[in-house]
Amino acid sequence: KDAPPMPSILGYDVVGEVIEAGSEAGNHLVGKRVVAMTRFGGYAEQAKTDYRACAIIPSDWDATMACALATQYCTAYYAAYECVQLHNGFQVLIHAAAGGVGTALIQLAKHKGCYIYGTYGSDDKKEYLLNQGVDIPINYRKVDYQKEFFNLSEGKRLDVAFNSVGGTTFKNDVSLLDKGGKSVIYGAAERSGKKGGIFSTLNLAWNFGLMTPIQLLMNSQGVIGINMLRIADYKPLVLQHCLQDLVKLTEQGVL
């Protein structure tokens, strides 16, 4: 139900100059160059969004680079800095680490001094992950990442798992968590591109597995789900904070 009615102009991420504000609350943005998130409609010459979904950026920033701060980096920031508290030395697993959100998570986690395991699916991505700061890249197509983690972690368990794949990987991640560990899930790529309609969706749900709150309670663990559309709709000030802090971190050279 999150899909827009057809015909529709797609696009979540925009960069440009604010030419008009619909209320006095957004007047301070008029004439400013901003990065913003939209509820679709971004692939157009002009776009409309909530003034709280904008952050002012330097006039000399590359538009393509700045656009990445919207959906991809906002998702990563919300996952890594709002939903959990990363600490120096934390053992962190990032699925699909070479993707947009994965890259952002690497940079944010490395900034906090975390030790990072990152999964990837093609050999050409390994060098990229090492350059980004991943300590242990794991090719999930060649090895069982769950077993590989246990082989390489020297008895340590995960403090945080960031998962955009879902399904069976979610169950595996939970089994890797340390006491006090958290699993943060923000996607279900295991379902993407598969035919079968409702049956594929039910299979995905089955693969996620079942767990009881008492299991989490006894181990002081947590499972956190993220849908940035819900944050944009119901917590726009949180979204604004994420965007503004991402701009600061970029200016500081962290990202």
Segments predicted by a language model, with ranges:
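NAD(P)H dinucleotide-binding glycine-rich loop of Rossmann-like/cofactor-binding domains
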Residues: A3-P7, Y12-D13, R33-A96, P137
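Short amphipathic alpha-helix with an adjacent loop that forms part of the alpha/beta core around
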Residues: D144-K156
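Glycine-rich helix-loop-beta junction characteristic of Rossmann-like nucleotide cofactor-binding loops
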Residues: E82-L86, S153-E154, S175
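Short glycine-centered segments of the SAM/dcSAM-binding site in methyltransferase folds
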Residues: R33, Q91, Y115, G181-K182, ...
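A glycine-/small-residue-rich N-terminal strand-loop-strand element
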Residues: V15-R39
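Short, glycine/polar-rich helix-capping loops at beta-to-alpha or helix-loop-helix junctions
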Residues: G42-E45, G121-Y128, L210
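Glycine-rich phosphate-binding loop and adjacent beta-alpha segment
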Residues: T168-Q252
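Mid-domain Rossmann-like dinucleotide-binding core that forms the NAD(H)/NADP(H) cofactor-binding site
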Residues: L29, L69-V143, K147
